[in-house]
């Protein structure tokens, strides 16, 4: 009888945990003002699905050459995206996706700053998010009209 109760309790805890609320974007994103000594700029807000994800650092990495592929593990992106990390300049890195990002999707990025420079423990990861635009274009064509034999127009 007690094993049955334990199993029921376990199932109840699992169900309640799986129904927990998701962390909002505001709660996920790091406070940029805390990172101003390390990060100058980063991708944010609404972006095209064909864009890359960039972070501009407040310091230079002399060992980086323009368009050099760098460590993939600097970014954790959710939902997962395949692509490569590139050093665009000595202080700008970009994640370049293999395929365009999904439209109308929020991506959460964790930038592991402590892999590049020594930081206080509370500043080891910079979290930010972007949302891709929904590409939407509608053309309504009614019929073809003509002015004369050489000129036509659409209604």
Which residues are covered by each model-predicted region?
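Sec-dependent signal peptide recognition
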Residues: 4-11
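C-terminal motif of bacterial Sec signal peptides marking the signal peptidase cleavage site
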Residues: 15-18
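Acidic, low-complexity Ser/Thr/Gly/Pro-rich repeat segments typical of extracellular/periplasmic
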Residues: 20-155
């Amino acid at each position: 009888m007690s094993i049955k109760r334990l199993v029921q309790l376990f199932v109840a805890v699992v169900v309640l945990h799986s129904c927990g609320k998701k962390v909002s974007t505001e709660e996920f994103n790091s406070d940029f003002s805390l990172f101003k000594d390390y990060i100058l700029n980063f991708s944010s807000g609404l972006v095209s699905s064909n864009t890359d994800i960039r972070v501009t650092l407040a310091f230079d990495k002399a060992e980086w050459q323009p368009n050099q592929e760098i460590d993939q593990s600097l970014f954790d992106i959710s939902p997962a995206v395949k692509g490569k990390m590139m050093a665009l300049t000595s202080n700008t890195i970009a994640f370049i996706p293999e395929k365009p990002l999904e439209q109308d999707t929020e991506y959460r990025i964790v930038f592991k700053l402590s892999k590049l420079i020594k930081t206080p423990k509370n500043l080891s990861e910079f979290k930010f998010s972007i949302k891709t635009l929904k590409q939407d274009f509608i053309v309504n064509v009614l019929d073809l009209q003509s002015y004369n034999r050489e000129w036509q127009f659409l209604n």
